[in-house]
Regions:
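Short phosphate-engaging motifs
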Residues: 198-201, 213
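Alpha-helical transmembrane bundle of multi-pass membrane proteins
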Residues: 1-198, 205, 226-440
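Cytosol/matrix-facing amphipathic helices and coiled-coil assembly/linker segments
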Residues: 206-228
Length: 440
């Protein structure tokens, strides 16, 4: 990429995805020890693990408003600072209720980062490389997940009653680094114009990003703002925005009813259900992280070449096949291929939904409601993540794996129909031209 500053800013903001992934997956190595330490019932245990996801719901709900009021840069700074508070507080908690408070704070940060980071990157990135740059956020999520699994395995092999505290507390180190780096980025030029009417500052930022296209981009943003002022801004939940709202809702809904967060949160438990020993199950979870990373790299490298819709189609087919095989393995109790089937599922997710979701949601809304649209898509994602993660231990214990994974497979069949018949291609389209492109 020619513009090093654009890449540097995008990478810096995408590091919030690393914190997102690390904090999301690190709990998988700690959850069983936490249950044993505080003698938690299955219901309270499920709540203690899912409480972070409930935090993501509120973080996503208010993330767009917060990013509009304070700016993308300040919002990202506070995300990093509160990630640090959550990591340290969770690690030193002496009872489950204190633990849940700090995990909830971490969830707020995850939810907010899933709104503000893709939003910021999409607003500074040129159309030709926007998919790649926004997808760096997802790459960092899966890199964080892989590091969490490796960290969990290393701390588990060291043994000791407090290894779970180290698993959670380690998140504080990258949190501090990210917080400091946010001070070095510039504010989004679109936010400067739309929220502050600061055209001069926006022009300076656009010149830093790409001097050759700065004037054209500035004119396009100002034209969009002028049209919006002339026509008036409709309420978010209005007929005018119904189609992008539906698109965002469905891609976020299908992301979670694939079962991805159930697998990530409870990976060791899923492998133990299939008969693996505890240490082997935790090590297999490291394989999940590595598979996720490799295929996310592939998806990120292809998203601006083949487009969002093609990757979603490939991922949907992979989902259906792998989930059906997992369900069959539980039904027949023949688990020889279970590890491979789960890895295939992760690969399908990484190259499809994983690479596409945050890019797609950040693109499909007009400038005047982009923050609200990003927040809505993220909110939908986290509401269903919280529900599925909370009920997964109960249903897996009561019914086993077969009906759960059949349900996920059927839902991915529905996703395939969504991709085929509804999803527009957004590759290479300028943000200000997106409204015309997707026909709403």
């Amino acid at each position: 990429m020619k513009n090093k500053k654009l890449l540097l800013w995008s990478l810096t903001v995408a590091l919030s995805g690393f914190l997102f992934g690390l904090d999301t997956a690190v709990i998988s190595g700690a959850e069983q020890k936490i249950q044993a330490l505080w003698s938690l019932s299955n219901a309270l245990h499920g709540l203690a693990i899912a409480i972070a996801l409930y935090g993501t719901v509120f973080g996503a709900m208010f993330g767009g408003w917060y990013a509009d009021k304070l700016g993308r840069k300040k919002a990202l700074f506070w995300v990093g600072a509160l990630f640090f508070v959550s990591a340290v507080g969770s690690a030193i908690s002496q009872d489950v209720y204190t633990f849940m408070v700090f995990r909830f704070i971490g969830g707020l940060c995850i939810g907010a980062s899933s709104v503000v980071s893709p939003l910021y990157i999409s607003e500074i990135a040129p159309a030709k490389s926007r998919g790649f740059l926004v997808a760096l956020f997802q790459f960092n999520i899966v890199f964080g997940i892989m590091i969490a699994y490796v960290s969990n395995y290393l701390f588990q092999t060291m043994g000791g009653e407090s290894d779970w505290r180290w698993m959670l507390g380690i998140v504080g180190i990258p949190s501090l680094i990210f917080t400091g780096l946010t001070l070095l980025i510039s504010e989004s030029p679109r936010w400067l114009i739309l929220q502050k009417n600061d055209i001069e500052s926006a022009k300076l930022v656009l010149n830093e990003i790409d001097p050759e296209t700065a004037d054209k981009t500035l004119a396009s943003i100002l034209h969009s703002k002028s049209n919006n002022a002339k026509n008036g801004t409709a309420k978010f939940f209005s007929k005018k925005y119904a189609f992008p709202i539906l698109l965002a809702f469905l891609i976020a809904f299908f992301n979670q009813v694939s079962g991805i967060n159930a697998i990530i949160y409870y990976a060791p438990r899923v492998f133990e259900m299939s008969g693996l020993a505890k240490s082997s199950a935790l090590l297999s979870s490291v394989g999940i992280g590595l598979t996720n990373l490799i295929f996310t790299m592939l998806g990120v490298s292809l998203i601006d070449k083949f487009g969002r819709k093609t990757l979603m189609f490939i991922g949907s087919v992979g989902y259906i096949i792998s989930l059906t095989l997992i369900a069959k393995a539980f039904y027949t109790e023949q688990f020889d291929g279970m590890t491979f089937f789960v890895f295939a599922f992760i690969a399908a997710h990484a190259i499809g939904q994983g690479a596409v979701i945050w890019v797609f949601i950040s693109e499909i809304f007009p400038n005047e409601i982009r923050a609200s649209g990003q927040a809505f898509g993220s909110l939908t994602h986290w509401v269903f993540a919280a529900i599925i993660t909370n009920v997964f231990p109960y249903f897996s214990g009561k019914f086993g794996g077969t009906p759960i994974f059949i349900f996920f497979a059927v839902m991915m069949g529905c996703q395939l129909l969504y991709v085929w018949f509804m999803m527009p291609e957004t590759k290479g389209v300028a943000l200000e031209d997106m409204e015309m492109q997707i026909g709403h």
